[in-house]
Amino acid sequence: MDYKNLVAERIKENTELEVDLIEKLIEIPPKKEMGDYAFPCFQLAKTFRKAPNLIAEELKEKINKEGFEKVVTVGPYLNFFVDKTILIKDVLEKVLSEKEKYGSSKVGEGKNVVVEYSSPNIAKPFHIGHLFTTAIGNALYKILSFEGYNCIGINHLGDWGTQFGKLISAYRRWVDEEALEKDAIGELLRIYVKFHEEAEKDPELEKEARLNFKRLEEGSEEETELWNRFKDLSLKEFNKVYDMLGIKFDSLAGESFYSDKMDAVVQEIDDKGLLVDSNGAKVVMLDEYNMPPCMIKKSDGATIYATRDLAAAIYRKKTYDFHKCIYVVGTPQALHFKQVFTTLKLMGHDWADDCKHVGFGLVKLANKKLSTRNGDVVFLEDLLNQSVEETLKIINEKNPNLKNKEDVAKKLGIGAVVFTYLKNNRERDIVFDWKEILSFDGETGPYVEYSYARGKSILRKAGELTGEADYSKLSSKEEFELAKLLGGFNDAIMNAIDKLEPAIVTRYVIEVAKAFNKFYNAHGILNAEDNDVKLARVKLVEATCQVIKNALNLLGIDVVEEM
């Protein structure tokens, strides 16, 4: 039963307010002893021509209280206490019947959502900063899909630009083919850095690089072949990381894909009378929006990121007719996206309002002990491997006889890293600390995973229990609080969609794990006082495990059945 909706329906019966508005006004009281839901009566003061506290008193007398333990007033608020037995029964039966679908809905049915995320640069390291966009984007993709949206995940690869002219020059001069086969990204990075060092002494190199890129733009066979090789080698490396994370994309259309679509966009901007000359460059003036001009073409005639993003947005709208187009890109790019979306609006594309920038913070290291292959760049693959190794050490200390411990270490180690990236508000910076990330105490991935594994261990020991559960036997505070939390899973998901914030689901599953451990520590389960209590508690454990598994899956994290 949706108690929030029930509260809204009961209030609607006695007021002229619509259910949707009432649901938006309903609050969760700050203290549990004040009730489960609270409705503020301020909105009714004009209609009833009375003080809100008097309205609350009147409604309390009139309202149908079926399904609620009691309804009380707290000043101008009408507070509802749900019937605990009914809630527990409703929630557990729903979880156990819907299983892996519990928490899902069809709210997004028939709506396409484009999610652009990850988007590393070809021939550059896939470093620890890239996991922020990758983890957030993957979680949003999964969360939105779970609620019925048809998601299109796009890896907008950085595979075009003058840097490829430089890389071609560097490759022809300094590449070590053996090193390239062993560590493609490392070798491409080495020669790219060397190009910049040498170009400071010899400016002719820059001219040569520009000529290389011009040839590439014109489709020259030799330059195109090299560019494709850089791309293939890079994707081979990137896919190692994506495989570790269990991530697949629906499209790899990167910057190069839009190279033949930009002239039409520039022409459209010009036709609308928006293109202005600024010191030889072509820009769209955005003064009235308190923004600097959006550069469309540089003074040398080259297009830049904004032009490509405009072309990409227009292409995606035509191809996918999206309900929303989400860009998971760092917060420093906020101005860039405001300029792009505003330019789209000025071009007459009102759907620009459906384009959303999802920003995120930076990744910092608590210490410098993370080994690096090249200077201060920490490769993501190395980080994930190191996390798996550290986790395996912990397992060998705590449970050396665990079956499949390498597989468990892989799931736990990678999951712990992803969980860390998704734990807090996405715009907050992350301070990376192994001790905290891999801890089995506190608000960490391993703590939630351990709670799940503990529950699964209880279920294995309980075996097959027959008979129908009597949920009235679950009468304690800990049992009610846990069941009530399980009932709030869909609310957490919908809130995450509304705010485009996966951390809401992460925080939710942490709270479920905490509530489960409180219940576990307060009550005997397998040694309960009688079989009826035992069966009801085992069902509560089963439902808890299901919700933890569903929540972690939405975050892109695999569960471990035993540890």
UniProtKB/Swiss-Prot annotation:
Q: List the CDD domains.
A: Anticodon_Ia_Arg, ArgRS_core
Q: Where does the record say this protein resides? A: Cytoplasm
Residue ranges for motif 'HIGH' region? 120-130
Q: What class of enzyme is it?
A: ligase
Q: Name one GO biological process term.
A: arginyl-tRNA aminoacylation
The yes or no answer to whether the keyword Aminoacyl-tRNA synthetase is present is: yes
Q: Which GO terms describe its cellular component?
A: cytoplasm
Assembly and binders = Monomer.
* Protein name, UniProt field: Arginine--tRNA ligase
Please report the organism this UniProt entry assigns to the protein.
Clostridium botulinum (strain 657 / Type Ba4)
State the gene name recorded for this protein: argS
